[in-house]
Amino acid sequence: RAKALLKNVEVFGVPNLCVLNEDPVGIASRFSGFFDKVLIDAPCSGEGMFRKDNKLIKAWEKNGPEFYSQIQRNIILAGADMLKPGGKLLYSTCTFSKLEDEDSVIHLLTNRPDMHLIDIKPYEGFSHGFDTDEGYHLEKAVRIFPHKMPGEGHFVALFEKDGEDYTSSKRPVSGKTKLPDELKEFMDSTTFEYDPAYINIRDTRVFLTSPYMAEERGLRIIRNGLLLGELKKNRFEPSQAFAMALTKDQFNNCLDLPVSDDRVIR
């Protein structure tokens, strides 16, 4: 899944990325109070997807809400710990299970008193979260039922962390980085903004790493930064990830082709 995630964010054109294959608690220990926003698409029993894929029913019989509940609770606490003061965390599942939905919300609010629920923009067909056995009223959480709006079954809750936001400091770099001529020539042909100090060349591959994300030892990192391309025989060949991150306006020379043009397919 981590490699599929990497492919998706690269095709989407995300320039500032770090993809990990790591336990959330391990990530939280390195990035406490680091992120402005955290999105949790939690692993769940998938009750909301039964209509879409009935194979999930057998998976549910093997590993139901009780199995996933503890995993979700560990993830949501780790997510809150990685959030900056003033930051927002969105917790979502594709299950109807109260144990995995409202009970996970209460687990976070009980164990992290600096987190509170905030409103989600309403849409026609949204339903409120269920009341809990402990007497909590979760009107700000959202349930999506397939008989009330298009789609399957989902649960969403949006949290905010108390305190004032602050800007993370950039990681220090030593000295100036001299870029290979062929790389500099290509970069100069674009208006893409970057700091050469954060260019990292590994063998022939060229990466633009995040100024805020150091190379963390002990973490299973799939990709830290944007793959710009590869140095090949005195030329620089840009990657698809870099091409997707650039807009048309960032090229000094641009050729517009209609969709019907054969050269688009080739």
What are the roles of these predicted feature ranges?
Residues 152-155, 162-266:
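Polybasic, low-complexity RNA-engagement segments
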Residues 1-33:
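S-adenosyl-L-methionine
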